[in-house]
Amino acid sequence: MAGQFTVRFNKKYCFVFITAWSASVRLMVNTFVVSADLEACAKALDYRRLGKQRVEAYQLWRALMGMTKGWVHHPATLMWKGHTCFLAKYCNTMIIEWQARGYKNNMALLPTCINPRPPWWWGWEPVIKSHQASLNRKMPDFYHFEVGSWKEWGYVWPSKVPERLRLLDVGPEHLEIERA
């Protein structure tokens, strides 16, 4: 069954009532990490994903800063826990690339630290390859990352990786992730 919803309006508000939702339709938030270099991450993204990254990184930052209750338990939020300064830098890098491409931007840069410390997983191949593989599947005409055995696997969520496996050179078969 596809997602069904009803929209009702009054003079001030628009209400959306979700009456049924399919497991195949997911609300998703993510930050794509396709390189250990922030600028390279931003430059590698297509127009649509780059635009979304600005908003999604901002939403995750707000959740981590306690400014909203949305997304607080999502793996994408948990992977940035303790690294709000680096997440702000990620968000700002997406905004700067968005503007450099000539698109109109209505988002302010987030406050950040002088030298933010990246999360433990930043630059870890399983995270990078799983995100590259996801983008290859989303837009095969645009993305052509070489992902090897990661081709058929889902995201590696750093918050779900057991400490004993963190930073090891492991393939998708060693991590508890679902096939895409």
Region spans (language model):
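Expand to "…catalyze enediolate/carbanion chemistry for C-C bond making/breaking, isomerization
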Residues: 22-180
